[in-house]
A protein has these predicted regions:
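General beta-strand structural signal in soluble alpha/beta enzymes
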Residues: 29-32, 55-59, 65, 86, ...
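A generic structural motif
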Residues: 1, 173-183
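N-terminal phosphate/diphosphate-binding loop that engages ATP/GTP or pyrophosphate donors
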Residues: 1-32
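Generic detector of solvent-exposed, compositionally biased contiguous segments
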Residues: 2-12, 53-65
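Loop/turn-to-beta-strand initiation segments
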Residues: 24-28, 50-55, 83
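Conserved catalytic-core segment of NTP-binding enzymes
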Residues: 37-50, 60-171, 181, 187-190
């Protein structure tokens, strides 16, 4: 959440605490830890939108793996979402599905390949663009973009450009992200 000038955020103690944290820090992460490793939302997306200019919701994690296909109950995209960004790590390209993908059986089904299949830029683009993959649950009124992350080496950058080209052929805009060498190891934006 990023701070907003709006003060119409409700009167509950939680909403007051969120508002105070936003005013003090400008950026706040909200959620409740459950099952030891999961984070659940804190308040409805509509309530959070009244408190902040921007609300980012992680609707579908990948267990820290660079690529995935969602389960039948994923992703949990709030109906009020304006935009959805599917994220893929470029370290997945050139690696076997069974090694770098969360829910590899679903990835294999979408690609028509086995767990030993080595992912190509076309595979990554197909997974991101698929209504059963990265585009799953995206409403027609929602903007859809892809973030091609971890393009930190020349080879990964080339893979990212290839994936971006394949996505562009499908009318999907993407952004390529990476750290420069001097930014690695401890960069904190906030």
């Amino acid at each position: 959440m990023a701070a907003s000038g709006s003060q119409s955020t409700g009167t509950s103690p939680r909403s007051s605490a969120r508002r105070a944290a936003l005013e003090e820090h400008g950026v706040v992460t909200v959620g409740t830890v459950f099952r030891g490793d999961k984070l659940s939302g804190a308040g409805t997306p509509e309530e959070l939108r009244r408190a902040a200019d921007v609300v980012l919701v992680e609707a579908d994690g990948a267990k820290r793996l660079p690529l995935k296909a969602p389960a039948e109950y994923e992703p949990v995209i709030p109906p009020c979402a304006d935009a959805v960004a599917a994220v893929a790590g470029m370290d997945a390209v050139g690696q076997a599905v069974g090694v770098v993908c969360h829910r590899p059986e679903r990835v294999c089904a979408l690609l028509g390949a086995g767990a030993e299949h080595v992912l190509t830029p076309e595979d990554a683009a197909l997974l991101l663009a698929s209504p059963q993959g990265g585009r799953k649950g995206v409403g027609e009124a929602m903007a859809f973009r892809c973030v091609l992350n971890k393009a930190d080496t020349p080879q990964r950058a080339a893979h990212a450009r290839a994936v971006a080209g394949r996505l562009a052929e499908r009318g999907i805009h993407s952004a390529i992200t990476y750290y420069r060498e001097e930014e690695r190891g401890g960069l904190c934006w906030f």
